[in-house]
Amino acid sequence: MSLPLTRKDLMIVNMGPQHPSMHGVLRLIVTLDGEDVIDCEPILGYLHRGMEKIAENRTIIQYLPYVTRWDYLATMFTEAITVNAPEFLENIQIPQRASYIRVIMLELSRIASHLLWLGPFMADLGAQTPFFYIFRERELIYDLFEAATGMRMMHNYFRIGGVAADLPYGWIDKCLDFCDYFLRGVIEYQQLITQNPIFLERVEGVGFISGEEAVNWGLSGPMLRASGIQWDLRKVDLYESYNQFDWKVQWQKEGDSLARYLVRIGEMRESIKIIQQAVEKIPGGPYENLEVRRFKKAKNSEWNDFEYRFLGKKPSPNFELSKQELYARVEAPKGELGIYLVGDDSLFPWRWKIRPPGFINLQILPQLVKKMKLADIMTILGSIDIIMGEVDR
């Protein structure tokens, strides 16, 4: 720890890794002077599973079902970056319909992630009612996911060159019905929460981050935009079809926990706006680039080769990564989710580096909680919005 313990009246408290307010298995060693926080040291790694090394010993096709375990509340984004990196590396074009379907799924996943941030965040502050309200809307999103992908979570829906299946009959009407219903729900949240004096007392001026600090610490997502920096990769990188829709980057200049709350509430509204435009303008055509299915040219087999030992052998699809390197990124609900990919003319990536937004955003926590009260730790930690699956990887 950074502070030498010279005073005898200081108290050291362990928060986590098993704690009802902890967002996953995070452990904080907090040094207290009464109720004032003197120092805070996060202890990470309880959920480390070696995901980068696993990626370097699998083909992209084999690895794809596993990536949903990074951020298991925004699984569409982990799938998106996993297929985007090889697509950019090999310059694979995806059909326009597939791109629109991806945008719809990504924005639905963004809303679901923000909802499951809002409920526990309010519960941390002592408000139980919104915690139950958010599950009502979140279940409707998961019903849409289940109808389109077959799974409520861990969808395994994105593919290199498109998506796994087209949208089923009647899905678009159900999606539009949800959008109309959810906009009324957001208004209900704001009436219930935003002007609540107890809520404002807990979040206003708590966990302040200036714009310069946010940039210097490498923060991204709502953490960055709440400090006055208008930076959204959907506008900056123009990936998928985001440049074909009319929407605004949500940002605030106050830089406190209230600003981060307002940014996420605004993002849910903008996501609905994007979904409505995408659903109404979705083009026809294929949902997958079928040329990519050929992946790798099969070698000429010999009669004594392994291929002929089993009559029913069906080789798994392979995708050879050329000898290049690139950095791909998407705007996930928690910030910039990136992949640094190095290929070396083999089926496995030579290097697969994950840049998780939660891991970077969590680094500023000790600075934010110093000189604050003990009860403010959960407010600040909740406003950061972390999932330990992607922090520890």
UniProtKB/Swiss-Prot annotation:
Keyword match NAD: yes
Known EC number: 7.1.1.-
Membrane topology: Peripheral membrane protein
Single GO BP term: photosynthesis, light reaction
One Pfam family it belongs to: Complex1_49kDa
Catalytic activity of the protein: a plastoquinone + NADH + (n+1) H(+)(in) = a plastoquinol + NAD(+) + n H(+)(out); a plastoquinone + NADPH + (n+1) H(+)(in) = a plastoquinol + NADP(+) + n H(+)(out)
Function: NDH shuttles electrons from NAD(P)H:plastoquinone, via FMN and iron-sulfur (Fe-S) centers, to quinones in the photosynthetic chain and possibly in a chloroplast respiratory chain. The immediate electron acceptor for the enzyme in this species is believed to be plastoquinone. Couples the redox reaction to proton translocation, and thus conserves the redox energy in a proton gradient.
Subunit record text: NDH is composed of at least 16 different subunits, 5 of which are encoded in the nucleus.
Protein family according to the UniProt entry: Belongs to the complex I 49 kDa subunit family.
Note: There is a 56 residue fragment from the N-terminus in a second position on the plastid genome (corresponds to 9311163); it is not clear if this is transcribed.
Name of the molecule in the record: NAD(P)H-quinone oxidoreductase subunit H, chloroplastic
